Curated annotation (Swiss-Prot):
Function noted in UniProt: The RuvA-RuvB-RuvC complex processes Holliday junction (HJ) DNA during genetic recombination and DNA repair, while the RuvA-RuvB complex plays an important role in the rescue of blocked DNA replication forks via replication fork reversal (RFR). RuvA specifically binds to HJ cruciform DNA, conferring on it an open structure. The RuvB hexamer acts as an ATP-dependent pump, pulling dsDNA into and through the RuvAB complex. HJ branch migration allows RuvC to scan DNA until it finds its consensus sequence, where it cleaves and resolves the cruciform DNA.
Organism per entry: Caulobacter sp. (strain K31)
Gene for this chain: ruvA
Name this polypeptide is given: Holliday junction branch migration complex subunit RuvA
Region of interest called Domain I, as start-end residue ranges on this chain: 1-65
Oligomer and partners: Homotetramer. Forms an RuvA(8)-RuvB(12)-Holliday junction (HJ) complex. HJ DNA is sandwiched between 2 RuvA tetramers; dsDNA enters through RuvA and exits via RuvB. An RuvB hexamer assembles on each DNA strand where it exits the tetramer. Each RuvB hexamer is contacted by two RuvA subunits (via domain III) on 2 adjacent RuvB subunits; this complex drives branch migration. In the full resolvosome a probable DNA-RuvA(4)-RuvB(12)-RuvC(2) complex forms which resolves the HJ.
UniProt-annotated stretches for the region Domain III: 152-204
Lineage start: Bacteria, Pseudomonadati, Pseudomonadota, Alphaproteobacteria, Caulobacterales
A cellular-component GO term for this protein: cytoplasm
Length: 204
């Protein structure tokens, strides 16, 4: 089974990426957090892989930016009712450290923010992940409401993403290039500057 891939980012889609390893393209399913953190097209990426086989779908590769992400994905799927889609959804809203914190606080509401995860399944996840090694670091008892709270984005960032989407750029790609541009240009960046930088990153 494949455990890790290092290669050039050939394509980035809504739910997957194509990684070119010495001329062989691997389709890797990734959550939105992982996709947003991939480097630009043509640049080298390293993904930790969980390989799964089923008679209906064949071999599927699930990619993660860190070993902890992959471990959390495996631990989540060991719970009855949690498949790959639900596990990815949980990790889209909670990092492994945030998930460990939610489990320690028995905060099923935080877990229940994941798409497709109802109250009963969220409770089962919180209950069954207790004492599981979700993260290598210390578990922080973060106050409710602070778990997975996304930093406030300046309005120009959202406007730039919307503008790129209006030009036909997929949302995940638009967010990735705009966030990268915002990090380089700083908080004072204008919408126009972010759009221009984003288009340059996309090669348009």
């Amino acid at each position: 089974m494949i455990g890790r891939l290092r290669g050039a980012v050939a394509e980035i889609g809504e739910e997957e990426a194509l990684i070119d390893v010495m001329g062989v393209g691997y389709v890797v399913r990734c959550g939105s957090r992982t996709l947003q953190r991939l480097p630009a097209l043509g640049e080298e990426a390293l993904l930790h892989i969980e390989s799964q086989w089923s008679e209906s779908a064949g071999l599927r590769l699930y990619g993660f930016g860190t070993r902890e992400d992959r471990r959390a994905f495996v631990l989540l799927q060991a719970i009855q009712g949690v498949g790959p889609k639900a596990a990815m959804a949980v990790l889209d809203v909670l990092s492994p450290a945030e998930l460990a914190s939610a489990v320690a606080r028995e905060d099923k509401a935080a877990v229940g923010r994941a798409s497709g995860v109802g109250p009963k399944l969220a409770l089962r996840i919180v209950t069954e992940l207790k004492d599981k090694p979700i993260t290598d670091g210390p578990v922080l008892m973060t106050a409710p409401g602070a778990v997975a709270a996304a930093p406030a984005k300046a309005a120009p960032t959202g406007d730039a993403v919307a503008a790129l989407m209006g030009l036909g750029v997929a949302e995940v790609n638009a967010r990735r290039v705009v966030e990268a541009a915002a990090a380089k240009l700083g908080d004072e960046a204008t919408v126009q500057a972010l759009i221009k930088a984003g288009l340059q990153e996309l090669g348009r």
